[in-house]
Structure formats: structure tokens, C-alpha cells
């Protein structure tokens, strides 16, 4: 499921925005395992969003007091996948546990129904799906966006609509006939009972008032 979309060039500020928004949307709950690629900004953004602020006590001595800082919370398990490339081709892949322990990573992977190793395959697959659904992002094409406003709008549309309108075969469940029935990410998360049409998704109020 796509939890957060922040269009634009990847920068440290955008990484912070993504992590903060994911924390907000999940109510601050720590995931069993967080994995990213080796982009350095994540190592500061993740404890910055989930961590506890520590204010150093005053010493009574002259000089500027030490600034408050964040520490990673207990239970945070975060690992990265680092790829080495030569001439644009991946020649080696290494993994590294940044927060938590190897045992905690192994325990999280042991509870997963789909992953047995630290990886970013879900994100990479989502990137491919995004390019397939949004022609503006296709490589080597004349359909690229000429106006950022339209590019941003279509990015939000296709990525968030994916949650409700895109049936995912691998997350399906067997029906009464024993056939696997594809589910949308929203169905798998218990947020919908059927695969929505684009018309349903576009006409559903963003906020429901009781």
C-alpha cells in the first residue's frame, strides 16, 4: 500500500517529509521492519520522526548550552540495501542493519509472508507499476510532463488510486471455488470490500461527516 506521496526530486527535505507523513498516517506506530536503499538522509530522518527528544541538562558553566537531540526509540528496526554500480550496472548488493539487531531483523522477516531477506523489491516493483500507470514517467517518450502542476496532480492521482483501484494478484485470497481472487491493497488492509472503479474513487468524499 502506498502510504505517502511527495513528488519531486529526492532531497533530504523530501525524505524528512515522507517519513514524517508516514509516521502521522500510521499513528506513530513503529513498523516491525523498515528498509530503504542507501540514501543517507534516511538515517537521520527516521529517528528524527520516531525518536525521543533529549534535552541535555545545564552544567552551570559558561558557554552555550548543548542543543536538544533525538535518539532512536527502543524497538526501532531499520536496515538498508546498498548497491554498487559500475557503468550503470549493479555489480554487488550489501545489506546493513542501522537500528536494532540482526536478531530483530530476522524475527521481523520470519513473520513476513513474502520476504525472507532485507530488500527493497516492493518499492522497486511499485516504481515499475507507477511508470506503467502514469505515462508521464515512462522512459524515452514524448509524453513527459511539460507543466509541473499537471505532473504533480497525476502523480497523486495514480499512486493513491492504486491503493483502491488496482487488483494485486499476489495479495489475493481463495474464493469458494478455490480460485485466487485478487485484492486491492485497500482490501488487504481492511479498508475496502471490493476493487473500486476510478469513478468510485474520484467521487468518494475525502472526508465523511457523520
Locations of regions flagged by a protein language model:
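Residue-level recognition of single "structural anchor" positions
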Residues: 1-210
Amino acid at each position: 500500500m502506498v502510504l505517502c506521496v511527495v513528488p519531486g526530486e529526492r532531497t533530504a527535505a523530501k525524505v524528512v517529509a515522507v517519513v514524517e507523513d508516514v509516521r502521522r498516517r500510521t499513528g506513530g506506530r513503529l513498523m516491525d521492519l523498515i528498509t530503504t536503499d542507501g540514501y543517507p538522509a534516511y538515517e537521520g530522518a527516521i529517528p528524527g520522526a520516531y525518536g525521543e527528544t533529549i534535552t541535555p541538562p545545564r552544567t552551570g558553566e559558561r558557554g552555550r548550552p548543548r542543543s536538544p537531540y533525538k535518539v532512536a526509540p527502543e524497538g526501532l528496526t531499520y536496515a538498508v540495501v546498498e548497491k554498487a554500480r559500475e557503468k550503470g550496472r549493479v555489480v554487488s548488493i550489501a545489506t546493513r542493519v542501522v537500528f536494532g539487531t540482526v536478531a530483530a531483523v530476522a524475527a521481523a522477516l520470519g513473520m513476513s509472508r513474502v520476504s525472507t531477506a532485507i530488500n527493497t523489491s516492493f518499492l522497486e516493483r511499485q516504481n515499475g507499476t507507477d511508470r506503467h500507470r502514469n505515462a508521464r514517467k515512462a522512459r524515452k517518450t514524448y509524453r513527459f510532463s511539460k507543466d509541473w502542476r499537471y505532473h504533480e496532480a497525476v502523480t497523486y492521482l495514480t499512486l493513491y488510486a492504486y491503493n483502491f483501484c488496482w487488483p494485486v494478484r499476489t495479495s489475493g485470497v481463495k474464493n469458494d471455488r478455490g480460485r485466487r481472487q485478487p485484492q486491492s491493497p485497500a482490501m488487504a488492509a481492511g479498508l475496502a470490500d471490493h476493487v473500486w472503479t476510478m469513478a468510485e474513487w474520484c467521487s468518494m468524499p475525502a472526508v465523511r461527516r457523520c
